[in-house]
Amino acid sequence: KAFQLFRAAVWEGDLNATIYCGYCCKTGAGLEKPNIVAAARYYEYGARAGVAAAQYELARIYIDKEMGDACFIGGANPYIGCERWLKKAAEQNYIYAEELLADKYYEGAYIVKDVKAAIYWYEKAANQGSVYAMYQAGYVYYTVPIDYNKAGQWFSLAAEKGNKDAEDVLRNHLRYNRFTKKWDAIR
């Protein structure tokens, strides 16, 4: 019943309902069985209309290759689809897209590896309150390019928000004087 209501809402112009229709199709909720191709079509409809959550969900389908290599909408390349839709959602400040886009840039998965772009998107998400992105920004600065002051700042912010991994990093590395004394209180 819920799917039919969401589908009716889409027909009446509620583009946000495309997210719910896509979810129902992807999971099979309210339907006889899941239908990933139908889910992708609903997400694409919302994505093309500028719905950030639909853009993000469509990118996730490309990443997960849930439809198989040959079944992408219009024969689209999953690598191109992933980056395209994640960027569109991230540019609308959709925090989950910012985090995932940064992950993909850092890993070089589905997108050409670009550490500067990863840092940009992690910091953007972190500045919106993402504790995950705060930790990840610290991790990137701790590894490549090495900047212990920035790493310490991001780890500290993540630790202040309750991220246990960031607390552990700060505790373990204070003894090497890699971070400034500001973080001594965390010992």
Predicted regions located by residue number:
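Short helix-capping/linker turns of helical repeat alpha-solenoids
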Residues: W11-L15, T27-A29, R48-V51, K65-E66, ...
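Terminal, low-structured helical/coil segments at or just beyond the last alpha-helical repeat
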Residues: K164-R187
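Hydrophobic face of amphipathic alpha-helices that form TPR/SEL1-like repeat modules
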Residues: T18-T27, E57-C71, L100-E107, I111, ...
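TPR/TPR-like (Sel1-like) alpha-helical repeat modules
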Residues: Y148-K164, R171
